[in-house]
Amino acid sequence: RMDIYFPKSGTPTAIILSCPGGGYTFTSIPNEGVAVANFFVPRNIAVAVLKYRMPNKHEEVPLSDAAKAMEILRDSAVVWGVPTNRMGVIGFSAGGHLAATLVTKFPTQKSRPDFGILVYPVISMDETITHKGSCLQLLGDNPTQEQRVAWSAEACVTDNTPPCFIVHCQDDKTVMVENSIRMYQALTKHKVQAEMLLLPTGAHGWGFSKQIAQKEVFESAMMKFIYQNL
């Protein structure tokens, strides 16, 4: 299911697909979906909030949903008058893993986002830094090393990965900040445009509806990144 939010008037300058978090057990729609739309729509950016299927140890399911959603949005953009090269994805926590997977493992060119925004994302399935609950739901109880690598976004970055903006709090006790650091390093290695903002405090799960210190710094940097990639 995908709920789409449009500006009240005029043609949107871009469309962003929002992938809420929830540890691959549910989708945190209010905080990381509706609140996302409430932020972007007044800035003339349409938002599609994706309620993707849970993997239940079938790792390909969420990516299939996200890729299909991006293809639908790109096809629909022609009708809506939105340039088809202004299609981004934003993801939070486990939804950040889904967004990172989409920007690195997009199954078709049409499903490739033009930019990605990763907010306190789960990136790696490496057992030393992964979010164990997300890994369990995605890969099951005893994933092979091959599975861990295949679904670690940092291991899937290529020269064709789109530009990414990453934000994480250093005091995040739910998803280790090393996830974002590894993703940034992989993007840099492949010379992909990347920006990473590390905030000293804020913990996890604040989304777009909760205030944290330096929230305005994040919002300003993120919007600058988006405009640079439109």
What do these predicted regions represent?
Residues 160, 166-168, 172:
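Short beta-strand/loop motif that positions the catalytic acidic residue
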